[in-house]
């Protein structure tokens, strides 16, 4: 159930909610980011847009144009060891820093990774709405207030 504080806006209304959008590049494709941002815009203003991943890899070349066009700040996270997810840790640390800044009405977590369930629960405990968007290639993302 979506919180009554954060509901989709009509085109005639000004979005009032300030949202932090955090994207897990390890579990998203560049091709679906624009439809996801359009969906997020229905719920408020994405005042922070960050994406986390290792952008030095050849596989990440498709991100550059999308990030520039949509004013998304890349947060570089090297893979220091195999099997460890440094990207997840970096995203979670930033989310907690943003939470304690008290500048946001909600968070949008763009990932298909269930590792962020604990983060979503913690953000909700602070009274914030959490929108979980799964970045599938056919983008049938569900906007939810429970991650």
Q: Residue ranges of each PLM-predicted region?
A:
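Acidic beta-strand-to-loop metal/phosphate-binding motif
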Residues: 52, 105-112, 119, 123, ...
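Domain-level signal for Mg2+-assisted phosphodiester chemistry and nucleotide/NA-binding surfaces
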Residues: 1-100, 121-124, 129-131
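Short, charged, surface-exposed secondary-structure boundary motifs
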Residues: 84-86, 140-145
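Short, glycine/polar-rich helix-capping loops at beta-to-alpha or helix-loop-helix junctions
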Residues: 59-64, 135-143
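Short alpha-helical
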Residues: 28, 58, 114-115, 138
